[in-house]
């Protein structure tokens, strides 16, 4: 079965630390000694040139009153319906890449056998200390599979240089391709070259009025700076050296 170790969608684009309770509840099936099958976790990395509900997610900031689940559901439906109508009327162009990568299965039994202790004989607090380490192992594998799409790559530059010439942007994206590859990332459509990636990303961002562009210069719309940051943040963990560390005391 599929699960989101983070416990939900990211509101700022960052890869979030895992929720220990979710995995702990699954792993506790091993407390039943008659259950002898291995538990295999297949890490999956997904990223997009466009997340349909990005404006809804970005709007859910900590310094604003929280939207109720019903309110968020209605807003999300409204955005999805609006996009569907645009597709129907052929008013919106291709949304770009939606890319998924699957990693090698992670065997819980193999990991557990290397612990030197049966974690299911421990009390809840100590067991969850071990489960937290397994969570981090899984999420680190997920993080290494998150693709770097053209829009994310361009936004990674624009978040630092909100006003930039197209030539400078293309040069920065070219360097970004090499940097992310060196960090072990999968760069989507890198074979097309930086110029092609920039052209496509700016087209999609421009259609949404996230950026303003003339023949020489690109400028981020200040009202949508957080949208640019959202896509840049989705690949920021490569530079930070991995996912945020689980704060174990919060989960015991």
Model-derived regions, located:
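Membrane-interfacial terminal anchoring regions of lipid-handling membrane enzymes
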Residues: 1-252
């Amino acid at each position: 079965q599929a699960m989101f170790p983070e416990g939900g969608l990211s509101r700022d684009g960052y890869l979030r630390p895992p929720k220990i309770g979710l995995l702990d509840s699954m792993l506790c099936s091993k407390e039943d000694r008659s259950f002898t099958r291995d538990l295999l976790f297949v890490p999956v990395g997904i990223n997009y040139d466009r997340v349909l509900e990005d404006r809804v997610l970005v709007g859910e900031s900590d310094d604003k009153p929280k939207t109720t689940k019903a309110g968020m559901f209605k807003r999300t439906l409204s955005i999805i319906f609006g996009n569907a109508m645009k597709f129907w009327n052929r008013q919106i162009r291709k949304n770009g890449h939606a890319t998924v990568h699957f990693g090698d299965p992670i065997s819980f039994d193999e990991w557990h056998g290397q612990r030197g202790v049966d974690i299911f004989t421990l009390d809840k607090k100590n067991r969850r200390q071990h489960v937290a380490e397994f969570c981090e192992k899984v999420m680190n594998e997920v993080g290494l599979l998150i693709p770097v799409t053209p829009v994310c790559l361009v936004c990674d530059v624009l978040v630092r240089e909100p006003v930039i010439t197209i030539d400078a942007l293309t040069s920065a994206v070219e360097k970004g391709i090499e940097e992310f590859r060196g960090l072990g990332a999968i760069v989507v459509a890198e074979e097309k070259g930086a110029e092609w990636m920039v052209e496509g990303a700016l087209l999609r961002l421009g259609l949404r009025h996230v950026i303003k562009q003339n023949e020489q210069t690109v400028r981020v719309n200040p009202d949508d700076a957080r949208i640019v940051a959202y896509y840049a943040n989705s690949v920021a963990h490569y530079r930070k050296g991995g996912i945020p560390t689980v704060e174990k005391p919060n989960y015991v």
